[in-house]
């Protein structure tokens, strides 16, 4: 466990992916702030998580306050709620690192890639929040159900996008804390690749009957430093 964890707000922390990430980071020694449109819902989620994991460093707040209290903000919200969420937190994230996990899925055709006109959700988020915010886009192709089972040994890689190498590295270290390997994958514009790949993985999982298949980077080199 880490001696001094970071304070991470998970906006959408009551959803499947958000709560799974929050649990993993809490177990890794970080301080977690659950964010939700409903403060009551966030508080209840935090209490359940604390009770389940036997850890006290988790609290719940409405999205704006949750983002204000944290040094790192993670967006794990459905695409339909994405723009509204950005508008809620924009004043609270100035100068901070924001990790964007949102994928532009268009129900019911979630197995078909449908990127925004800007090219990717990651780029939309960076444009909207402004240059003072360091947006990193990641964790698109990770199984929320596998993440949520804290006893499940994860096996997969994560591509990490962003315009600032140091910020990507911070995200990579946090991703390692949940039990996954992560890779620098270039600028925020490149996030389109993983956002589209999510729909591809949904199709593959359904077509072949896989349970949360993901991606893996293969190299002839045994060990590569992130």
Predicted features along the sequence, with ranges:
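NAD(P)+-binding Rossmann beta1-loop-alpha1 motif at the extreme N-terminus of oxidoreductases
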Residues: 1-48
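Phosphate-coordination loops involved in phosphoryl transfer and adenosine-cofactor binding
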Residues: 4-7, 95, 155
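Rossmann-fold NAD(P)-dependent oxidoreductase module
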Residues: 20, 24, 128, 174
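Rossmann-like NAD(P)-binding element
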Residues: 53, 57, 61-97, 103-109
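General beta-strand structural signal in soluble alpha/beta enzymes
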Residues: 60, 134-138, 183-185
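Rossmann-fold NAD(P)-binding glycine/threonine-rich loop
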Residues: 102-145, 149-150
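Active-site-lining helix/loop region of Rossmann-like oxidoreductase modules
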Residues: 156-226
């Amino acid at each position: 466990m880490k001696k001094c964890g970071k304070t991470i707000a998970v906006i959408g922390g009551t959803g499947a992916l958000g709560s799974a990430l929050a649990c993993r980071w809490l177990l890794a020694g970080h301080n977690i702030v659950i964010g939700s449109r409903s403060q009551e819902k966030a508080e209840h989620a935090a209490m359940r998580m604390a009770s389940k994991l036997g850890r006290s460093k988790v609290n719940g707040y409405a999205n704006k306050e949750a983002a204000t209290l944290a040094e790192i903000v993670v967006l794990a919200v459905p695409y339909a709620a994405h723009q509204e969420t950005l508008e809620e937190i924009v004043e609270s994230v100035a100068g901070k690192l924001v990790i964007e996990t949102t994928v532009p899925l268009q129900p019911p055709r979630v197995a078909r890639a449908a990127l925004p006109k800007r090219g990717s959700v990651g780029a939309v988020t960076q444009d909207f929040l402004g240059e003072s915010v360091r947006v990193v886009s990641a964790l698109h192709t990770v199984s929320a159900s596998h993440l949520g089972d804290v006893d499940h040994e994860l096996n997969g890689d994560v591509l990490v996008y962003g315009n600032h190498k140091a910020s990507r590295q911070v995200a990579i270290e946090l991703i390692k804390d949940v039990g996954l390997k992560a890779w620098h994958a270039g600028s925020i514009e490149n996030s389109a690749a993983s956002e589209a790949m999510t729909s591809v993985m949904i199709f593959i999982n359904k077509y072949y009957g896989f349970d949360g298949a993901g991606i893996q980077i293969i190299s002839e080199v045994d060990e590569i430093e992130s």
